Regions:
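Short, conserved sequence motifs used for protein processing/export or organelle targeting and
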Residues: 2-204
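Terminal edge beta-strands and adjacent linker/stalk segments
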Residues: 193-196, 291-305
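Enriched for extracellular/lumenal, surface-exposed ectodomains of secreted and cell-surface proteins
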Residues: 181-185, 243, 272, 279-295
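Asparagine-centered strand-capping/turn motif at beta-strand->loop junctions
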Residues: 98-100, 226-230
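Short acidic/proline- and small/hydrophobic-mixed sequence motifs that coincide with surface turns
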Residues: 104-107, 231-236
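Boundary/junction segments of secreted and surface-exposed precursor proteins
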Residues: 199-216, 304-312
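Intrinsically disordered, low-complexity Pro/Gly/Ser/Thr-rich segments with frequent PxxP/GP/PP motifs
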Residues: 149-155, 247-274
């Protein structure tokens, strides 16, 4: 692999939900590299030179010759990265081995990032119009400060095991782990490695699409639209819901939604307090399978309770 990429999604110049999912880690790296505008790019920890009449750090100034030249530099390290999941597919476990080909000293740190190789949206999730995102950093392990490794002697291998209880992952099939050795004093990246996406993950994905939002009666029966993006019929779910910020309730649903089909689930009737706007939040939880896409399991809606006058 000649290039290993990490993208840190910021909250400027526009809104970005992927920044909101992990603000501390992004903010830390933005400060570390003194980023004041985006897009901004570094290669091996050094800002891209402005040799294309743009600005320092402009991604447009990166050429294939630049990449080839950087890849040709001999590194003192070899990095091997693998990852796996626990049985419930809720935790990712990371194993990194760093081997030095020669004695290496300095303020050395190992940085490890959980990334999603590809995230594609049907409509822009933010305010910049983009729908395609690649190599998005989701979590730095164990934190944005990385792991201090100490010096290496030639031939020495050091192993590191890290884990993360995952959140805000769009698709487990696209998870990759990027690990890189960096001199924290100079910010120079000395070597990087990346894991391959895990093979054999279950093809299971249930999505909550919408919930009914208009009612003429204070007696409101929420109806949730659910799509089964899996290869087998969906026969049971737990639907966790809350109205107007109240205590969450769980409705155990059984039935059948065919593979690739969309169905509806009617929740127990609730009484709304007064006309006007009310809020409902819904999450679907698989009880029999592993849902590889955990972000589309949630839906929220504002309920409009109409104040209808009854003629006398």
């Amino acid at each position: 692999v000649k290039v290993v990429s990490i993208k840190y999604q910021t909250n400027w110049p526009g809104v970005d939900p992927m920044y909101l999912q992990n603000e501390p880690d992004v903010d830390s790296r933005v400060g570390y590299y003194s980023v004041s505008g985006v897009p901004d790019a570094t290669m091996d920890g050094v800002h891209i030179a402005n040799d294309c009449a743009a600005y320092v750090g402009a991604p447009a100034c990166v050429s294939q010759d630049d990449i080839d030249a950087a890849a040709a530099i001999t590194s003192p390290f070899l990095i091997n990265v693998t990852h796996s999941f626990n049985a419930e597919y809720t935790t990712v476990n990371v194993h990194v081995e760093v081997t030095a080909g020669a004695d290496v000293a300095g303020t050395l740190k190992l940085q490890v990032a959980v990334t999603e190789k590809e995230i594609l949206f049907d409509t822009p999730p933010g305010s910049n119009g983009e729908t395609e995102f690649y190599g998005v950093m989701k979590k730095l392990l164990p934190s944005a400060t990385g792991t201090t490794t100490g010096a290496f002697y030639g031939g020495e291998t050091k192993s590191f095991d890290l884990s993360w209880d995952m959140s805000n992952i769009y698709n487990l099939n696209n998870i990759q782990i990027v690990a890189f050795m960096q001199d924290d004093a100079t910010k120079k990246v000395l070597q990087a490695g990346v894991s391959s996406p895990a093979a054999g993950l279950p093809v299971v994905d249930y999505a909550a699409n919408s919930v009914s939002a208009i009612t003429c009666s204070s007696e409101y029966t929420p109806v949730v639209s659910v799509t089964n993006n899996s290869a087998a019929a969906l026969t049971s779910l737990d639907v966790v819901y809350s109205i107007d910020g109240g205590a969450a309730a769980t409705y155990p649903w059984t039935g059948s939604i065919a593979a690739g089909a969309t169905g509806t689930i009617s929740l127990p009737t609730a009484t709304l307090a007064g006309a006007g706007a009310h809020d409902i939040e819904v999450e679907i939880v698989s009880v029999s399978d592993i849902d590889i896409n955990m972000v589309n399991d949630n839906v929220a809606s504002s309920i409009g309770l109409l104040d209808v006058a009854v003629p006398s």
